[in-house]
Amino acid sequence: MENHLGENHRRCTLQKRNVTRELKKGKHTMYALKRVKKIYIRVHEITQIDNQTYQCLEREQNFCENLARMCERTYTEEKPYRCDMCEKTFIQSSDLISHQRIHNYEKPYKCSKCEKSFWHHLALSGHQRTHAGKKFYTCDICGKNFGQSSDLLVHQRSHTGEKPYLCNECDKCFSRSTNLIRHRRTHTGEKPFKCLECEKAFSGKSDLISHQRTHTGERPYKCNKCEKSYRHRSAFIVHKRVHTGEKPYKCGACEKCFGQKSDLIVHQRVHTGEKPYKCLECMRSFTRSANLIRHQATHTHTFKCLEYEKSFNCSSDFIVHQRIHMEEKPHQWSMCESDFLLGMDFVAQQKMRAQTEELHYKYSVCDKTFHHSSALLQHQTVHIDDEYICNMSEKGLDLSSHASETSRVS
């Protein structure tokens, strides 16, 4: 073997150590043993020629030569294989090929038990452990178990706050590379996932799957407490907190807790004064996107009646107007079976009815009567003297004690 390390003298140039010797000692094992030896032997059908030399029968290439070259790249950080889609670089061409499957949505490795597909064979191996019930990787912080080391690594970033994947357009960071790829589509406008029913397109496959449930009516996430069901897993997780009372998102300024992260973000704007949603017509700003949308209707007159061509700024006004055409009166008074178009008319009728009813609560000082005890207590504040003579007992009483001794008219 002429090119077998040049008589064992080819070395890792940066560290000045013989590669095969260090491989035997167990050093550099992170990359040499786990990465090179394990994968090359499995993928390239490596055979051992002697105690130090391995050769790939498929490609007729010397194993130690490649091992030395790859070891050097780990120290020099040389990554000659570049992805044309996202500019990410790799040490091995095989890593680039696996990575490109993410962009091409190619998942050639399919699980025989659940037909779930994966873009890398190692991801499939980790997934298959979930069927076997094996989870080898445990988080030191919270004790959660994972079937793949990559899943554990991503999970640990939730504790450390590490977000190594940076968007070069807006400097936003992500803990997963797949989230970065999806985020980039917001800049490019790319929506590669299309619904076959309505041809609506989406930037992420999960969004497409959730959308398709609007056509099928499928609600796979069911609550075992109240039997409510949801199309989206995220909505299901939020709902479960209604039963558990869990509020995992705490405000650092006032320690108020919230069940949803979005509610915490909106709340924090109370402390910061941030109003990120700006109207381009009048430059007015809002803390919530919903408030901006409602405000924008004042400029566009979004809600228009087709019968009279009348426009409304507010959806609630538009709904009330439509009831005129439909002769719909949703507010019903149970005592007289009268129907009302507007809620405020309903409230007014309740007040009128109350005026004709018997007055139950009488104040013995001035003989005024009231429908409710709360109204009687409020009336007592009109009398500014601290003490009155009760006309029933002729004793001096302060207002607080006198309130309890006023009689209810039968």
Curated annotation (Swiss-Prot):
Q: Name the Gene3D superfamilies on file.
A: Classic Zinc Finger
Question: One Pfam family, short name please?
Answer: zf-C2H2
**Molecular function via GO:** cis-regulatory region sequence-specific DNA binding; DNA-binding transcription factor activity; zinc ion binding
Q: Where in the cell is it found?
A: Nucleus; Cytoplasm
Residues in C2H2-type zinc fingers: 81-103, 109-131, 137-159, 165-187, 193-215, 221-243, 249-271, 277-299, 303-325, 361-383
The record's annotation in SUPFAM superfamilies points to:
beta-beta-alpha zinc fingers
PROSITE patterns attached to this UniProt entry: ZINC_FINGER_C2H2_1, ZINC_FINGER_C2H2_2
Q: Which residues carry this modification: Phosphoserine?
A: S400
Q: Which GO terms describe its cellular component?
A: centrosome; cytoplasm; cytosol; nucleoplasm; nucleus
Query: Coiled coil: which residue ranges?
Result: none
Principal place of residence:
nucleus
The record's Gene Ontology biological-process terms are: positive regulation of stem cell population maintenance; regulation of DNA-templated transcription
User: Could you tell me which InterPro entries the record lists for this protein?
Assistant: Znf_C2H2_sf (IPR036236), Znf_C2H2_type (IPR013087)
Please provide the record's keywords in A-Z order.
Answer: Activator, Cytoplasm, DNA-binding, Metal-binding, Nucleus, Phosphoprotein, Repeat, Transcription, Transcription regulation, Zinc, Zinc-finger
Other noteworthy facts: Significantly enhances POU5F1/OCT4-SOX2-KLF4-MYC (OSKM) mediated reprogramming of mouse embryonic fibroblasts into induced pluripotent stem cells, and can also substitute for SOX2 in this process.
How it assembles, according to the record, is: Interacts with POU5F1.
Task: Give the similarity note.
Answer: Belongs to the krueppel C2H2-type zinc-finger protein family.
Briefly state the protein's biological role.
Transcriptional activator. Important for maintenance of pluripotency in embryonic stem cells. Binds directly to the POU5F1 distal enhancer and the NANOG proximal promoter, and enhances expression of both genes. Can also bind to numerous other gene promoters and regulates expression of many other pluripotency factors, either directly or indirectly. Promotes inhibition of MAPK signaling during embryonic stem cell differentiation.
Q: What is this protein called?
A: Zinc finger protein 322
Source organism per entry reads Mus musculus (Mouse)
Lineage, broadest ranks: Eukaryota, Metazoa, Chordata, Craniata, Vertebrata
